[in-house]
Amino acid sequence: MATMVAQKLSHLLPSLRQVHPEPQPSVHPEPVFTVDRAEVPPLFWKPYIYVGYRPLHQTWRFYFRTLFQQHNEAVNVWTHLLAALVLLLRLAIFVGTVDFWGDPHALPLFIIVLASFTYLSLSALAHLLQAKSEFWHYSFFFLDYVGVAVYQFGSALAHFYYAIEPAWHAQVQTIFLPMAAFLAWLSCTGSCYNKYIQKPGLLGRTCQEVPSALAYALDISPVAHRILASPEPATDDPALLYHKCQVVFFLLAAAFFSAFMPERWFPGSCHIFGQGHQLFHVFLVLCTLAQLEAVALDYEARRPIYEPLHTRWPHNFSGLFLLTVGSSILTAFLLSQLVRRKLDLDRKTQ
């Protein structure tokens, strides 16, 4: 009897296995989203950051998936991505209150919002996708620098148009916007060149930081002059507080950008959170938001001041804006081609 039962079970088990097959191991294992610094080329290394790097030469889908993974660029991506979404919301509010089509004095306001959204979006994209390969690392950060140049000119235009005092306008009206366009392009070129030559010493910092410092000094001069010339307390000028905030936030952002703080104090402890570049992003976002509030208040409240100043333009600011965008994109493209040749040559000599 027992033998007959065993024989029946032996015939039944194969059929059960066919109905309920055993789970097979996945042909495509879950990808590894982060690796140690030793597993990526030195080009991708960050000072004092030893883990949290993403592997190279994965699919584009892989890098887009890392938007929702922990790695050492995640905070950099999200700070500027969320800020870009906030700017879209702010633009929607502006569209409901500002006549961008009918009011000729509203165009600089639209340009500064567009420029801010551009630099935030390109920055988020660069930090998200730069780990694809050496070539794309260079190319996306070149594009990031284009966004910075666009934002620099947009800021200069908004300050010159809405925030400037008549006394300072009389001194700089013929040179301000052409110089702002040139310095924005020079800042983009210097940053791209510094990235290309990969010299961390004095030469590299000079190429990147000196043009940017000169551009900021010119761009913020209408605001600085107004702050210094205004009586204290300026209760009748609510935009002035936002202008002061944007200056403070920018200086803090510049300090964290240059000093690699606090990761230099806690090496190996700031892989995901607490990097100086992340704090640079946060303070730059705060600077941009404070700036937009100040410019919006100036657009509404200072019309009797700025309308007479801009009845006749010595320069076409829309043309200068497009020139800044076009020249910066061209510079980034040309340097990306130099990078391609350099990488191809390195592969041939290996």
UniProtKB/Swiss-Prot annotation:
<keyword id="KW-0896">Oogenesis</keyword>
<dbReference type="GO" id="GO:0005496">
    <property type="term" value="F:steroid binding"/>
</dbReference>
<feature type="topological domain" description="Cytoplasmic">
    <location>
        <begin position="127"/>
        <end position="139"/>
    </location>
</feature>
<keyword id="KW-0754">Steroid-binding</keyword>
<keyword id="KW-0446">Lipid-binding</keyword>
<dbReference type="Pfam" id="PF03006">
    <property type="entry name" value="HlyIII"/>
</dbReference>
<feature type="topological domain" description="Extracellular">
    <location>
        <begin position="340"/>
        <end position="350"/>
    </location>
</feature>
<feature type="transmembrane region" description="Helical; Name=1">
    <location>
        <begin position="81"/>
        <end position="101"/>
    </location>
</feature>
<feature type="transmembrane region" description="Helical; Name=7">
    <location>
        <begin position="319"/>
        <end position="339"/>
    </location>
</feature>
<feature type="topological domain" description="Cytoplasmic">
    <location>
        <begin position="187"/>
        <end position="239"/>
    </location>
</feature>
<feature type="transmembrane region" description="Helical; Name=5">
    <location>
        <begin position="240"/>
        <end position="260"/>
    </location>
</feature>
<feature type="transmembrane region" description="Helical; Name=3">
    <location>
        <begin position="140"/>
        <end position="160"/>
    </location>
</feature>
<feature type="transmembrane region" description="Helical; Name=2">
    <location>
        <begin position="106"/>
        <end position="126"/>
    </location>
</feature>
<keyword id="KW-0217">Developmental protein</keyword>
<dbReference type="GO" id="GO:0048477">
    <property type="term" value="P:oogenesis"/>
</dbReference>
<feature type="topological domain" description="Extracellular">
    <location>
        <begin position="261"/>
        <end position="278"/>
    </location>
</feature>
<feature type="transmembrane region" description="Helical; Name=6">
    <location>
        <begin position="279"/>
        <end position="299"/>
    </location>
</feature>
<feature type="topological domain" description="Extracellular">
    <location>
        <begin position="161"/>
        <end position="165"/>
    </location>
</feature>
<dbReference type="GO" id="GO:0048545">
    <property type="term" value="P:response to steroid hormone"/>
</dbReference>
<feature type="topological domain" description="Cytoplasmic">
    <location>
        <begin position="1"/>
        <end position="80"/>
    </location>
</feature>
<feature type="topological domain" description="Cytoplasmic">
    <location>
        <begin position="300"/>
        <end position="318"/>
    </location>
</feature>
<feature type="transmembrane region" description="Helical; Name=4">
    <location>
        <begin position="166"/>
        <end position="186"/>
    </location>
</feature>
<comment type="similarity">
    <text>Belongs to the ADIPOR family.</text>
</comment>
<keyword id="KW-1003">Cell membrane</keyword>
<keyword id="KW-0675">Receptor</keyword>
<feature type="topological domain" description="Extracellular">
    <location>
        <begin position="102"/>
        <end position="105"/>
    </location>
</feature>
<dbReference type="GO" id="GO:0003707">
    <property type="term" value="F:nuclear steroid receptor activity"/>
</dbReference>
<dbReference type="GO" id="GO:0005886">
    <property type="term" value="C:plasma membrane"/>
</dbReference>
<keyword id="KW-1133">Transmembrane helix</keyword>
<keyword id="KW-0472">Membrane</keyword>
<dbReference type="InterPro" id="IPR004254">
    <property type="entry name" value="AdipoR/HlyIII-related"/>
</dbReference>
<keyword id="KW-0221">Differentiation</keyword>
<keyword id="KW-0812">Transmembrane</keyword>
<comment type="function">
    <text>Plasma membrane progesterone (P4) receptor coupled to G proteins. Seems to act through a G(i) mediated pathway. May be involved in oocyte maturation. Involved in neurosteroid inhibition of apoptosis. Also binds dehydroepiandrosterone (DHEA), pregnanolone, pregnenolone and allopregnanolone.</text>
</comment>
<protein>
    <recommendedName>
        <fullName>Membrane progestin receptor alpha</fullName>
    </recommendedName>
</protein>
